[in-house]
Amino acid sequence: MCTEDVIKRTKAVQKWRVYMVKGLYTAYTGMINEQNRLDILSNNLANADTNGYKKEGATNQTFADELAIKIKDTSYYGMPQKLGTMSMGVHIGETYTDYSQGNFRVTDNSTDFALDGDGFFAIAYTDKAGNTSVKYSRDGAFVVNTAGYLVTKDGDYVLNQNGAMNADAGARIQVDPNLPITVDEKGNIFQNNQQVGTIGVVDIEDYNYLAKYGENMYDLVNGGVRQASTAKVTQGCIESSNINVVSEMVNMITISRAFQAGQKVINAVDETLDKAVNQVGRV
């Protein structure tokens, strides 16, 4: 074999190896992407029975195309030789929350509430360090404590309308714990035919300013604007999560297959590279 043929063959092998390594990296990023999607999906399934939980999802985004050149090849007027462009795989583009309304579950409990429409209950949440801040939730499973305050199952205070609109954690709702309560669709609370308070319901102008906190609560980040809600309060019901378990299971199977396909690609490229190094290189 003449020197010119050897040079041509060597260059061809170099170009081929670049695309083989690219195949490895593309498969690797694809597997990482599918693993992240699986983590999100698993969290959705784990919270399928969580009151007011909102489904999360993720979008895929490709890395920017990179210009590939031959390493140390400046034979063309001293300029690097181009191999073309290549995409270096995919990654999670954005994790988003689906705020669509879940189904209502009838409980006939007078302190259980669901919101029909856009909006959130306002909760004065106290963390383990004793710090209190206003959170927003669609979970209306409340109780009346011994002091007569309307609270969540964890004991955090439910805010009235003034507290909800102004993020006033001290604007609590207090009723007579010994009397039954009735609540209309505007959230007005009645005992003995007299209004004793109003459940605070507020909406957010742009949901992109909501950050998930825990399983079914949200923080309003800087720049977020509260606004009046048109949601109707339904007594004796709780909003379930908006998770479709069957659909999520189908997606899990699809993701698992995509992950396995990435494994097969890596194995195939690994075997091919092994032959290139140990067999083709000897020729």
Where on the chain are the PLM-derived regions?
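Amphipathic alpha-helical polymerization modules
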Residues: 2-283
